[in-house]
């Protein structure tokens, strides 16, 4: 919420918003946050007893086996590297950053999703393929048919789309802020770019699309970096938190470093 306030130029409301958030959460025994960055953000604004509880991913649904030759031909009949984005086309996602990616030689850009900024983005990036909203098998095939997944928004508390791309065997270029910091290991399963230096975003994408060895290495590590994070395992962790609170162990969470 505070991140959205920044994007929509409501900065003056942020202190009041954080006080409101803290007042609500401090009535609970613990607060579960989806990423290390979210834990830090909440604690630094007065929220107590915060514990990281990351999200799971369906590694069967999001799988390299869904890579589809016909779909790849639709995305790029010229044999270009396919760079994809999946998400809501709204201001806070900062999808306009993809303008520079679309200009890279040998790249075909695919934007999956819908939202209030779609018409504007279609005019800004006429060379991109806008698929609209996708779900189910269609979405699984789209993820697996990308060569690179590029994420633009810098205010993500987690970013499930990154997990889904990685589970699909696709290396990721994402901002070194918020949730992506827990998901992307720089140079291992993708690249992190500096939000303060806009050019590092397109540089990260360019490294993968022009360096075959780098692309192959990061792609080979992508799925393994998240496939252990099944929904069964993360829900078991959640049940453990419930049990701890039910047994009166909430004080043990104070200052927890998870």
Predicted regions and their residues:
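Donor nucleotide-sugar binding/catalytic pocket of nucleotide-sugar-dependent glycosyltransferases
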Residues: 11-67, 77, 130
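Conserved donor-binding/catalytic core segment of Leloir-type glycosyltransferases
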Residues: 76-106
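Nucleotide-activated donor-binding/catalytic signature segment of Leloir-type glycosyltransferases, i.e.
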Residues: 119-137
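Short alpha-helical donor nucleotide-sugar binding micro-motif in glycosyltransferases
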Residues: 133-134, 141-146, 238
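Aromatic "clamp/platform" in nucleotide-sugar-dependent glycosyltransferases that forms part
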Residues: 154
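Short hydrophobic beta-strand element within catalytic cores of glycosyltransferases
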Residues: 171-174
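Conserved acidic donor-binding segment of nucleotide-sugar-dependent glycosyltransferases
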Residues: 186-187, 191-198, 207-212
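A short, well-ordered alpha-helix in the C-terminal region of glycosyltransferases
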Residues: 214-228, 240
């Amino acid at each position: 919420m505070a991140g959205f306030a920044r994007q929509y130029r409501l900065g003056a409301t942020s202190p009041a918003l954080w006080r409101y958030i803290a007042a609500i959460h401090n009535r609970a025994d613990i607060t579960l946050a989806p990423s290390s960055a979210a834990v830090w953000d909440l604690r630094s604004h007065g929220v107590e007893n915060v514990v990281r509880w990351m999200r799971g991913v369906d590694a069967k649904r999001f799988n390299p086996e869904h890579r589809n030759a016909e779909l790849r031909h639709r995305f790029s009949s010229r044999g270009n590297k396919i760079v994809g984005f999946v998400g809501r086309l709204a201001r806070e996602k900062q999808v306009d950053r993809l303008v520079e990616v679309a200009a890279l030689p040998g790249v075909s850009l695919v934007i999956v999703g819908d939202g209030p900024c779609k018409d504007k983005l279609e005019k800004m990036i006429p060379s991109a393929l806008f698929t609209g909203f996708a779900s189910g098998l269609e979405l699984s095939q789209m993820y697996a048919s990308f060569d690179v997944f590029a994420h633009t928004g810098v205010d993500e508390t987690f970013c499930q789309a990154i997990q889904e791309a990685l589970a699909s065997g696709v290396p990721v270029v994402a901002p070194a802020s918020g949730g992506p910091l827990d998901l992307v290991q720089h140079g291992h399963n993708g690249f992190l770019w500096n939000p303060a230096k806009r050019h590092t975003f397109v540089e990260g994408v360019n490294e993968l699309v022009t360096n075959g060895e780098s692309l192959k290495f990061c792609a080979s590590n992508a799925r393994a970096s998240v496939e252990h994070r099944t929904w069964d395992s993360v829900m078991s962790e959640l049940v453990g938190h419930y049990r701890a609170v039910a047994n009166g162990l909430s004080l043990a969470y104070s200052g927890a470093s998870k």
